Amino acid sequence: MATPPKRSCPSFSASSEGTRIKKISIEGNIAAGKSTFVNILKQLCEDWEVVPEPVARWCNVQSTQDEFEELTMSQKNGGNVLQMMYEKPERWSFTFQTYACLSRIRAQLASLNGKLKDAEKPVLFFERSVYSDRYIFASNLYESECMNETEWTIYQDWHDWMNNQFGQSLELDGIIYLQATPETCLHRIYLRGRNEEQGIPLEYLEKLHYKHESWLLHRTLKTNFDYLQEVPILTLDVNEDFKDKYESLVEKVKEFLSTL
């Protein structure tokens, strides 16, 4: 993928809160293209920053290449909880979903004190949100009987408490939904070759796709967060490979941001 030069950001409408950081979540199915897309956005504008999914934490990768991926005791001493979840979901789904959400909250909170503090028109793109953690992935695992009733009740209670403590800082100004068919996502899973994902069946992706569509396209999925019903959503069709043909998608993002 060609590296686009960084340049000045588009002119946005002045916010009544001055330089308050606009927070946008990039949502979509597994392998829809979120990582590729946020990396494109990060390179386009000095006032744009991204918070990638902390996959390294989940896979126990000993890497300090990313500012959001510094090692923790749980990462140094733990196993590959992503792989454990895929291999034995009935045993590890609750553990994985709890840790995935915890590591996401930690990374996203840390980013708020980063370089965007001094930006003129700061925009922070999250690769997924605490809401998809619960209402897409954890919910699907519960409905698939990979979490029992007690685990699901504890998870929801824990998620509510964590959001009561930290959620206001992470409330979204907008959502960008990268829409791709389950078949496209399955093909991209194969192409990117992440070992933990190679056994994912099409049926699993179809269930996640249905939940994404209900939440972000039809807006029929109910949550405990009333404000989400009013959050603007931009849907982008990413069934075609966009790594080297992203200009039209970026223009839609700029137009979307100008309305927030």
Curated annotation (Swiss-Prot):
One Gene Ontology term of the molecular function aspect: cytidine kinase activity
Effect of residue 100 to V: Strongly increased catalytic efficiency towards deoxycytidine
Sites where the protein binds substrate: 53, 86, 97, 128, 133, 197
Location of the active site: 127 (proton acceptor)
Domain of life: Eukaryota
InterPro entries reported for this sequence: DCK/DGK (IPR002624), Deoxyribonucleoside_kinase (IPR050566), DNK_dom (IPR031314), P-loop_NTPase (IPR027417)
Modified residue annotations for Phosphoserine: 11, 15, 74
Reactions the enzyme catalyzes: 2'-deoxycytidine + a ribonucleoside 5'-triphosphate = dCMP + a ribonucleoside 5'-diphosphate + H(+); 2'-deoxyadenosine + ATP = dAMP + ADP + H(+); 2'-deoxyguanosine + ATP = dGMP + ADP + H(+)
EC number: 2.7.1.74, 2.7.1.76, 2.7.1.113
Gene Ontology annotations for the cellular component aspect, listed alphabetically: cytoplasm; cytosol; mitochondrion; nucleoplasm
Outcome following mutation: residue 104 to M: Strongly increased catalytic efficiency towards deoxycytidine
Binding sites annotated in the UniProt record for ATP: 28-36, 188-192, 240-242
General function of this protein: Phosphorylates the deoxyribonucleosides deoxycytidine, deoxyguanosine and deoxyadenosine. Has broad substrate specificity, and does not display selectivity based on the chirality of the substrate. It is also an essential enzyme for the phosphorylation of numerous nucleoside analogs widely employed as antiviral and chemotherapeutic agents.
Subunit organization: Homodimer.
Name of protein: Deoxycytidine kinase
Organism: Homo sapiens (Human)
Originating gene: DCK
